[in-house]
Amino acid sequence: MAPVPVSVSATLAPPPAAPPKTTSRSWERRAPADAAFAAASSVAGSAALLTLTPAAPAAALSKEDVAGSLTKAVDTVSQAIDVGGKAAEQVAAVLKALGEAVKPALPVLKSASDEALKLAAPVVSAASKQATEALQGAGVDPAPVLSVAKTAAEQSTKVIDAAKPVASAAVETITSLGPEDYVVAAGXAFLAYLLVPPVWSLVSSSLRGYKGDLTPAQALDKVTTQGYVLIDVRSEKDKAKAGLPQLPSNAKNKLVSVPLEDLPSKLKGMVRNAKKAEAEIAALKISYLKKIGKGSNVIIMDSYSDVAKTVAKTLDSVGFKNCWVMAGGFSGRKGWAQSRLGTDSYNLSVVEVVTPSRVIPAVAGRRTGTTAARIGTASSASRATTRKLLPGGVD
């Protein structure tokens, strides 16, 4: 008899109660509670994934399901710990929730993780102590698995270098598995996050195709304090309607606009995926900007964070390994505008713009030529001009 599909939603635990609302307008104060709630929700989903019976995965899961669930879990937990949630009680609560998620799957985890932990033993980080305590606090005895691993107090760079071959092997293994092995892979990788964060960081990045997702608040912090470059790939129409991110004066030069190409109707009918093609063309233009290099930290922002992922993946594939995506984009439910971080009017703002190329005809009302322009209060007339400029020209 064919295996009966198991509904993921049927295995979900009741969602935790929402954290109490705060009247503070400071995103730094709200972030830990919001992130912890997101982490708890993600953990519930991961628990559902891990508690599927071995007979079910062939019908219930795909490679995309596994990669998506794992990266979502790690991203939300990382937010809880990194965005203002460094207090000991915050970390302990998140790790205990993770322990509860792993608990039902331990029989599956052990057989899948023994060899992985032997390879990862030299790179077990100090975080394993917190993970161990959290598992024990949740009533899980991790001793049989942890006995394989040995603590290593090494510098972070050495840990990451040592983790690379393990992560590479893990990615190859996960992508080559058959459907019947997906749950085992999911469980092993999830436990690897608890015990060996450097390995999981590299694995999740490879599965995702780009560095990771940042909340709007995280993106603002990275741009203003660490020099990250924020690249807005929205169309001029979308920017005029929704506005631009409001940045401090010392960070305004970190915002660059590279609108997606608007392929002509005839050309759209000739390509397999016009939306993807437009995003990949924008990524190639970004890769040639003088402002950024392959070692630069870049955050891609679109309207709802869907197209931005394609842009980030394309940049990663050509050597830009530090590409992030702003979760929710500018206009999404958890995007910049909804995060109340400040919005500037497009007509009154100053942002460096790379306009569409001459190879692809511009739509009506848009300039031709690949140019860098300064958009300001006096720029509306210049945007309406029909002058053709050579590539790289500046007006």
Swiss-Prot record:
Keywords: Chloroplast, Membrane, Phosphoprotein, Plastid, Receptor, Thylakoid, Transit peptide, Transmembrane, Transmembrane helix. PANTHER family: CALCIUM SENSING RECEPTOR, CHLOROPLASTIC, RHODANESE/CELL CYCLE CONTROL PHOSPHATASE SUPERFAMILY PROTEIN. This is Calcium sensing receptor, chloroplastic. Residues 1-39 form a transit peptide. Residues 40-182 are lumenal, thylakoid. Residues 1-12 have a biased composition (Low complexity). GO terms for cellular component: chloroplast thylakoid membrane. The chain crosses the membrane at residues 183-203. It is a single-pass membrane protein. GO terms for biological process: cellular response to calcium ion; de-etiolation; regulation of stomatal closure. Its main location: plastid. Residues 204-395 are stromal.
